[in-house]
Amino acid sequence: MSIDPEIGSRHLLGTDGLAEQPNAMHQCVRIVITQDWANSVSGQLIAECLVNLLARQVGLVEELEIVSAAVPLLIHPIIKGVWQTLTEYLVAVGEWAVGMKVRTGDNSSPHEADHTIVIGGATTLDSAKTIACIADSWKAWVGELKNVPDDRPSPSLNPVGPFFAAALAAGEIFKRTWGLRRGRFLDNHAYSLWKNSMSSVWEELDAGPALNELHLPPFVLVGAGAVGNALVYVLTHLENRDMYPVLVDDDVYDKTNLNRCSLAGTEDLNQEKTAVLASRLEAVGIASFPFSGDLKRFVNDARAGMRADVAEEIGAGSYSMVVSCVDKGDGRQDIQGLHPQWLLGGSTFDLQAKTNVYAGEKDAVCLGCHNAREHQGEAMRGIERQLRAMSHQERASFLTEHGLEVAIVEEYINDSHCGHLGRAALMDFVSTPPPEFSVGFVSLGSGVLLAASLFRNLLSGETIPHASGMTTFNFLNGNLGEGSLARDPQCQICSKAAEYQDSISEL
C-alpha cells in the first residue's frame, strides 16, 4: 500500500526556525537497538514510540529499518494482534500507522541509511552520522553516539522517560532532514521530567520514583486530538490501570491528523476520535467513557452508561479534575467555565510543547486568559465585503479555489438572508482556520509533559495543586523550562471586569 502524501501536509508547511525548504526528502532511517536495551521495557518503549513517530513524518521519512536481535515482546501492544518478537511488532506498528513498510534484521542491510538512531550504545558505528538515545524512568537522553552515557537499562516500567527520549530523537531526525535557520542540533542533552531539569551530565539528574503506587482519580479529558492522543498513549503503558477517563470530542480523524495522532492509524479514518481512544484503553484493560460531541452537549447530556459515581458528581456540576487538550479559544473558555477543582492543559506552538497547571489561587491566570472567544460576526461581514468588491469572474475564481460552491454563494451575495445555504457555507469558511504547522513529536512531547505534571502532583500527595505553573520544551533548541503566565486583565472569566459584571447580575 502506498502512503498517502496528504498525511504529511501539515509538517511540510514548515515553521519558524526551520530552513525555507527541506534539505532532503524521502530519507531512510535505521534504528539500531543494542541487545541489552532490546531486552528491556525502557528500550522497547523507545523503539515502539520511535517507529510510531518516524513513520508519520511522511514525505521526509520514506523507509525505516530496524536492526535488533529477535527478542520477546515485553510491552503491551497499542494495536490488536499477537507478536512473538519485538521486531515483528515494530513492523506492524509502521504498517498500522500510515502503511509504512519496515525492514528488520539482525544486521544492517547493504543499503546506506541517511540517518541512524541507536537505542543504547554501539561503538562499531560511525558516530559522526549517528544519534543515540536512552531513558530511565523519568529521565531521557539524546545526543551524538560518541557522547552516550555508559548506562545499562534499569528495570523501570515508567513510560515517561522512554517516550520523551523517542520524541527527542524523532525531533532530531526532523531537524536534520529539514535544516535549521536558528536553533541547534542536540549533541549531549539529558532531561529529568521529575524535576523538570536538564544537564549535560546524565548522572546528575533525578530518575524519580516508580509509578506502581500512582492512582489516577476519574477525570474529564476534553480534546481527543494529537495532544489528547499522546496523553492516552502514556496512560496505556502504566502499570496501574485503575483509572477512568471521560473522553469528550466532537471530531473524527482525517488524513491530516495521522501525522501527529499517535493512537490513530489508517483504519481509523472517519472514526470518532473518542471511540478510537476508548478502544485503545480497553485493549489494555482501562475502562473509559467516550462522548462524541462538544462540551456544551456533554454537560447537558444524560451520560447513559457512565460509571455511576462519576455520573453523579458531574450531574451535580462538580468537576474534580479536567484536562484540556483543545486548541481553540471557545473550547478553552467553555472548559474554564466548568470551574474544575484541578485543571491542566497541554498544547503546542510551532516546535514548542507546553503544559499548564491552573490551581485557581487568587489573582492567578485561568485557562480563559489570553484565549478569547472567536467572534465570527466581524469575519463574516469582512468576507461579504471582500466578495461584493470583486467582479463576478474574480468571485467565482476565489470561491472555486477555496472549495466553496459558486452558485449558492452567488445567490446569497445577491440576496442575503439568514439561513441561506450560501451563508452557512461562508460561515463555515470564516470559522475554519487555515492549516497550521504541526508534527507528531511535538504533540507527543506535550502529552508527555502533561502526563509528567499530572503524575508529579499525584505522587506528592496533593489532591489539588497548590500553585499554577507552566512547563515548556522547545524542540528547536532543546531548552526545558518552567514559568508562569500573567493574568489577562481582559479575561471574560477571571478579570475584575468579569467579577464586576457578575456582581451586577446578582443584584
Question: Which residues fall in each region the model found?
Answer:
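Adenine nucleotide-associated cytosolic modules
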Residues: 1-507
